[in-house]
Amino acid sequence: MLLPKIVIEPEARRLFDDIGIRAVTWQEGYLVVDAVEAVSKSAAAALNAGARIWVGINIEDVVIREGDRVAGVVVNWHAVSEARLHVDPMALRAKVVIDATGHDATVCRGVLRKIPGARMLSPQGDVPGEKPMWAAQGEAVLVENTREVYPGLVVAGMAANAVAAGPRMGAVFGGMLLSGERAAEI
């Protein structure tokens, strides 16, 4: 909701402590951090660790290789897509693709749409979407739902609960942080 503060659980505090983000106890079981500090210091830490952050792009497709394993993504500039210009996209190869696209699980849905017979590691083999909001339960199952759901494709964050039909989470971000950590470990 673009608020100036975000809430995390104590379990995720160590991730912020590691990169110097200040957290203040709000009430038992919850900490509050400055949203701008969290985003800017997290981005800087990721860049310092070797990540590349591309802004203003859309994922149009996935790259596949033997056995229809996901081996990268096909991207284009968001402005190109919005203007409906005919500009060739660019393929980016990757050992593993992490779908952290949120509630829509866009990469997973693209795999299901474009690869005949593809099935996700989910209750029905598809992307059923999240159940209605139950923030505490959604946070509780999020790390468990963070996993490889198709060869070469890992889900994290809200996309993980969308694929696993977990409850929608509320405006608490600790589970999202721990889900991202888990995805990186996979």
What are these regions (language model features)?
Residues 1-186:
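Residues forming the flavin
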